[in-house]
Amino acid sequence: MQGEDPVSEIGDIFQLIIMEMLRKICKQDPSQKPRLMNAIFMMSESKSPSVLFECANTITQLTTAPSAIKVAIQSYLNLLQENNDNNVKVIVLDKILQLRKNYFKVLEDYINDILAIIKDDTIVSLEINQKVLDLITYLVSQRNIKEVVQFLEREILKATKMDEHGAQGTVTNEYRYLLIKSIN
């Protein structure tokens, strides 16, 4: 993997095979892990969503180092921002939610990126919004409470305006309920 060619020029399937091989080697021979983690980090720069997802999963399986977990979280967040498929977003959010207990401090640094997941003027998916709200309410701290409260207030106003314009009636009411529940 050394040389001038960027990771993105290697096909997705080949990248996934390499990722699986690296994961297996690291699990079978942990002494190889420090050397092979660099290759995994290089692959986290892939443009392929499936490779990015597998890379993040591999990192979280092989290490607990905060710097490595940051790479995994950033990969997950990139997937959330670049992907329009709600099913993919739900799966990725579930992965991030699994990290929240062990990596609270690391995730806390990404609160703005997490807030940005809910950015549309429409409610695309209540399930996605609920998972994001669950995550941000878990990550609220003295350091970020002001940002989170301002975000929740903006979202309540947005839902109220949508309701006044007759957009997405029941969904808007459910979303507003989730927001109010998050504040409490």
Tell me the role of every PLM-derived stretch:
Residues 1-184:
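Extended alpha-solenoid helical-repeat scaffolds
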